[in-house]
Amino acid sequence: MIRRGDVYLADLSPVQGSEQGGVRPVVIIQNDTGNKYSPTVIVAAITGRINKAKIPTHVEIEKKKYKLDKDSVILLEQIRTLDKKRLKEKLTYLSDDKMKEVDNALMISLGLNAVAH
């Protein structure tokens, strides 16, 4: 089953303009109820181009810890809804602490403020 925090290879083509494309890693950011019942999934693109400008919507992930080909950056300003058929292979999953970083960067990307419970 696809779960929030899983990292998959996905085919993001075709693209336009500055969108991330090709077959590349993505992290699942959709909630697990949606992951279970929906034919689509919400993801954030991951790039291995670590020299990209570090901005508050970027979260770094280490290749050794997450069994990736290279140190990478999750681009929370590059979120997309994909058909699950675009997901190819599960690579790894992110730790709870790393997902907290993802959540924070996602809130910044979407202009959301933290809500007190």
UniProtKB/Swiss-Prot annotation:
Organism: Staphylococcus aureus (strain bovine RF122 / ET3-1)
InterPro entries, A to Z: PemK-like, Plasmid_toxin/cell-grow_inhib
Family: Belongs to the PemK/MazF family.
Subunit text: Forms a complex with MazE which is no longer active as an endoribonuclease.
Protein name, per record: Endoribonuclease MazF
SUPFAM superfamilies with a match to the protein in the record: Cell growth inhibitor/plasmid maintenance toxic component
Record-linked Pfam families: PemK_toxin
Keyword RNA-binding recorded: yes
EC main group: hydrolase
GO BP annotations listed: mRNA catabolic process; rRNA catabolic process
Taxonomic path: Bacteria, Bacillati, Bacillota, Bacilli, Bacillales
Record-listed E.C. numbers: 3.1.-.-
Purpose: Toxic component of a type II toxin-antitoxin (TA) system. Ribosome-independent, sequence-specific endoribonuclease that cleaves mRNA, thus inhibiting protein synthesis and inducing bacterial stasis. It cuts between the first and nucleotides of 5'-UACAU-3' in single-stranded RNA. Neutralized by coexpression with cognate antitoxin MazE.
UniProt key word Hydrolase: yes
Keywords, alphabetical: Endonuclease, Hydrolase, Nuclease, RNA-binding, Toxin-antitoxin system
